[in-house]
Amino acid sequence: MSLTKTKRVSDVAKELGVKSKEIIEFLNEYYPRPDGKPWKASHGLDEQALEMIYDAFGIKEEEEKEEVVTEQAQAPAEVEEKKEEEKKEEVIVEEVVEEKKPEVIVEEIEEKKEEEEKKEEEKPKKSVEELIKEILEKKEKEKEKKKVEKERKEEKVRVVEVKKEERKEEKKEEKKEEEKPKIKMSKKEREIMRKLEHAVEKEKKKQEKREKEKKKKEEEVKIIYIPEVITVRELAELLDVPANKVIAELMKRGVLATINQPVPPEVAVEVAESFGYLAEVKKEEEELEEEALLKEEEEREEELQPRPPIVVVMGHVDHGKTTLLDRIRKTNVAEREKGGITQHIGASQVELPDGRKITFLDTPGHEAFTTLRARGAKVTDISVLVVAADDGVMPQTIEAINHAKAFNVPIIVAVNKIDKPNADPMKVRRELSEHGLIPEEWGGDTIFVDISAKTGQNVDQLLEMILLLADILELKANPNKKARGTIIESKLDRKRGPVATVIVEDGTLRVGDHFVAGTTYGRVRAMFDDKGRQVKEAPPSTPVEVLGFEELPEAGDELIVVDDERTAREIAEKRKEKKEREEKLQTIRLEDIYKKIQTGETKELRIVLKTDTMGSLEALKKSLEELSNEKVQVKIIHGAVGGITENDIMLAKASGAIVIGFNTRPDPKARELMEKEKVDVRLYGVIYEAIEDVKKALVGLLEPIKKEEVIGMAEVRATFKIKKVGTVAGCYVLNGKLVRGAKARLIREGVVIYDGEIESLKRFKEDVQEVTAGYECGVKLKDYNDVKVGDQIECYEIRYEKPTL
């Protein structure tokens, strides 16, 4: 047989006397074409294909004959085997049956009986009773014997039946195997099939192993701790991934950093999570030491004792806050001191006839909420909102309500000045109901008390309501532990040095205690109560003026008693260093809020809104709130008419909000404070601009959508190697256009093997900017030379689109 390339499938089929279809099926299965197309009768065959066909079909007839002969030879052998098996079964059955024959058992029993009778005759004669007893015993023994024999017989029959069933099943399986159609294959085909089966089995085991490993990895929770200061290189080493992958993840989050640059800790956590880790920022050793030193003692229920409630009185100017506090304290401070009680210690405590006490914050309500809350302090338990019955709800009243609601402090409404002729307490109730404060008598949950601070009417009832609410809140503290408190206000006294008003929240503060407060520390040299009397100790909820600070503390700082001066000094110094580092990064910016919204950290965009008119306020508030959707909410935490004040800035700082001013400007104090606290204030003259800016915040202005667009496709038809240049691809542009400097991919057999850019583009030795469809050109890919004829070059560009709501 001649093995040449000229032979076609149909020629070989005729030569071997088989159908072309059989050979085509064989080739498609065991020798597919390189281009993936099916074989046809007209296709030419190479040497290897011919060899496989002759091996498979050349000895077909001989194999068939051999199979017929073997089948004939096997037939009588199988018959003989069956006969032998049947004989064996019969023998087994006979053996079992032999053992079970009742005649044999009867003969044996009779023989035994005869022997026993002879023995009995030889023995001396027994009494009738003994004989009867023996007969009965024998009968019992015989019954037992028969029972045992019967059980043995049944067991043997059962064993035989089981064996028969097993043999029947085996025969059925053998028949099924024999009935299966046998595929006639040559030795070479059998070898190929064996190898294929082995390869499939091997691949199957590998796949199972991979799946097990994958499942094991998924089940394992990888936890890592990221230090507060970490570079890209260190992060890559920690995650055990290449640095370029870390840089790519950082770029996705809008952070451009080189391998030696530091990564913000919150971004490092996100990158770690993208690689399947559960990450958290590792606290500095100094911070951990501080936490250990300042760790609160475990509270035991039996050590806790009721403490007086801390109440803040809020309301609009001239609605009677100072007069009410004056009436409660039964003093005349408002008349004797310039500026009222706010010029005194800053807080006061009153004792009622029944011995119970209430602590009142004398600082203005809004200041108590903003300045203190901005630094994370939680001092106030209850707020009393004073509203004049003859004036109704005013701008500062609404501001006070918003402050209280923002921090979930329960409100008691004191409707003041009911002694005036034009007083209308019901009007106050109606107006406050519109702001969510519905009276209890109307089915709501807000306590309303009609009072007259001037005459003292119903003031006792107001105090009862405060104590009732305090009982419901179950306010308790442990007076026997080291003291913790909050600084309400501080001042620098020329004679006494730094002085601060402190409300003790837990434990008891004593003269001589060493303490740390924010970034300063000290030792209690002296304490004075709200009436100016010197005291040696201050239990929970007691306001005192403290002397002994090294530096002036800030309002809102937490005062914590420690063991000694050295501990206090070390903690204060470390806090000061940390604060200096944080001040460089800490700022409330709109851009930061964008990022928080995108990462799901912030679910609502908080806004303090100030406008020139009520109409503008209502229109802008409605427009901004309509931008809310299921994912992100716009929340106007405070809206009012007028200029941007110091209070607005502090509220924004406290609640993480931005300030939007429409046709308004911040006053000098507010401007100074916004720069100091770094609160973002946005000023607008057109409603549309304000809406657009907030809209951009919601959709994520700093994270545009990345989109890729293919602009052209070319086919490589020749390659040229040029010294000092590399491989140049001679291309034909199939569609679109190729652009010099544009991004490009090299595709070979459907697989991307290069992704870079077009370094140079030429037409007849001339550099060109672009080449359109239907033209030839020379293309040099940047830093890549392994280009082959038949490859395709895909030219594309990346566009960034802004997301929409």
UniProtKB/Swiss-Prot annotation:
Residues 306-474 form the tr-type G domain. Residues 452-454 are annotated as: G5. GO terms for biological process: translational initiation. GO terms for molecular function: GTP binding; GTPase activity; translation initiation factor activity. InterPro entries: EF-G-like_DII, EFTu-like_2, IF2_II, IF2_N, P-loop_NTPase, Small_GTP-bd, T_Tr_GTP-bd_dom, TF_IF2_bacterial-like. Residues 79-89 have a biased composition (Basic and acidic residues). Residues 362-365 are annotated as: G3. Its main location: cytoplasm. Transmembrane segments: none annotated. Keywords: Cytoplasm, GTP-binding, Initiation factor, Nucleotide-binding, Protein biosynthesis. Residues 340-344 are annotated as: G2. Residues 68-89, 141-215 are annotated as: Disordered. GTP binds at residues 315-322, 362-366, 416-419. SUPFAM superfamilies: Initiation factor IF2/eIF5b, domain 3, P-loop containing nucleoside triphosphate hydrolases, Translation proteins. The keyword Kinase does not apply. GO terms for cellular component: cytoplasm; cytosol. Residues 416-419 are annotated as: G4. It is found in: Cytoplasm. Residues 315-322 are annotated as: G1. HAMAP family: IF_2_B. Belongs to the TRAFAC class translation factor GTPase superfamily. Classic translation factor GTPase family. IF-2 subfamily. One of the essential components for the initiation of protein synthesis. Protects formylmethionyl-tRNA from spontaneous hydrolysis and promotes its binding to the 30S ribosomal subunits. Also involved in the hydrolysis of GTP during the formation of the 70S ribosomal complex. This is Translation initiation factor IF-2. It comes from Aquifex aeolicus (strain VF5). The gene is infB.
